[in-house]
Amino acid sequence: MALALFDLDNTLLAGDSDHAWNQFLAEVGAVHPTCHAETNDRFYQEYVAGVLDIHEFCRFAFSPLAEHPRAQLDEWRKRFIDTLIRPMIAPRAPRLLAEHREAGDELVIITATNQFVTQPIADMLGVDHLIATLAEEREDGEFTGELTGVPCFQEGKIERLRQHLADHPDPEGTIAQASFYSDSRNDIPLLEQVGRPVAVDPDPTLAEHARNKGWPVISLRDTTA
């Protein structure tokens, strides 16, 4: 079956779950409210500008995971998903996912945001396969605060996707035959590799790149489109 790849933040979601999660942690008192929020905003601006140091960001984002018991993190995450993420789903995203599902495609969310935050979002959207940045866990399920494996960011998305395909071999499920939907300049490396790149509510850099390449540009937020 053909691959249908979807970025998550600002693509299927009308917002950024990673930034929102770190903001949420500050609001519930899990981290220093001012320092953490300011650093979170700085990293987000670097991400938007295409200059984010993903390893530095992972150290920042994974530190709170190691500082609190998993049971408490799970409780916070449930509240976060219910109150902030459900309303963040882009209005036309469920229909797009349904169209690919009905076509028999293999749906994959591929995101730089860590798996702890994004697994319940993928489940909520009914997407079976998630490729995300991984926070290291101990055998008891508690987090160490460290990154494990290749961050699923920029060129790292290509490497992680290749790993996924090696683990899920399918003659039709190749990168060259895949569709990929994204909003971000950071995903241009993978967009260049797939057979059907689609810019979704793109940032200015991706919008210009898509125009130059003749790629489709769509909105999952504009319900009148």
Where does each model-flagged region fall?
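Acidic/polar active-site rim loop that often engages polyanionic ligands
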Residues: 18-21, 58, 139-146
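Active-site phosphate-binding/coordination module
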Residues: 17-25, 70, 134, 151
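Active-site neighborhood of HAD-like aspartate-dependent phosphohydrolases
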Residues: 1-49
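Metal-dependent phosphoesterase signature
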Residues: 57-91
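Short, compositionally biased "basic patch" segments
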Residues: 44-70, 133-139
